[in-house]
Amino acid sequence: MESEDLTKTLEILKAISDLELAIAELYRCFSEFRAPEKEFWTALGEDEEKHARLVQKMIQMLLDRKFFCAPNGSFNESGVTHLKNFVERHQRKLQKLEIPSDFKSLLSIAWNVEYSLSEMNYTNLFSITEGELESLLLTITSETAVHRSKIGSKITVMRNSLPRSHHRGAPKGQPGAQRKVNSKAPLLKFT
């Protein structure tokens, strides 16, 4: 890899490592606000710290030139910065109690974070990778998918446990739907 490509790739990997640590810190903050789900948030936070360590290992591998890879210029590095800003902003707001700290709200934030991570798809960092580097990228990507699935499952359980009204009328415009009479409307006379 040429030195310019190496420098840019190292900068991106450093930003990804910082992002993973910021997400770990956000989940740790969630665990402090939500004692009933402390284990859930703590486990996610520990995984994010692990991801940061894996990215740091990739940085060291690049510096040691232990493998062949070719950077992919299509990776959107600004997405990393935007997501990190999103994570840090929500953590600040939560600490200042400016946003709700109920489980549903925190799950929603976490879902957005994990969805954004999966959309970034770290495997797009390189057009060609080999060996351990590829394995590390796939580990992070697959564990992110697992996080998204766990969070999605919790959201589904919450949605399905909400009480639902049994007295719903038929939707507007549907046959059999009774319509309210508008007392202000002029009545039509049939003769």
Residue ranges and their predicted role:
Residues M1-T191:
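Non-heme di-metal
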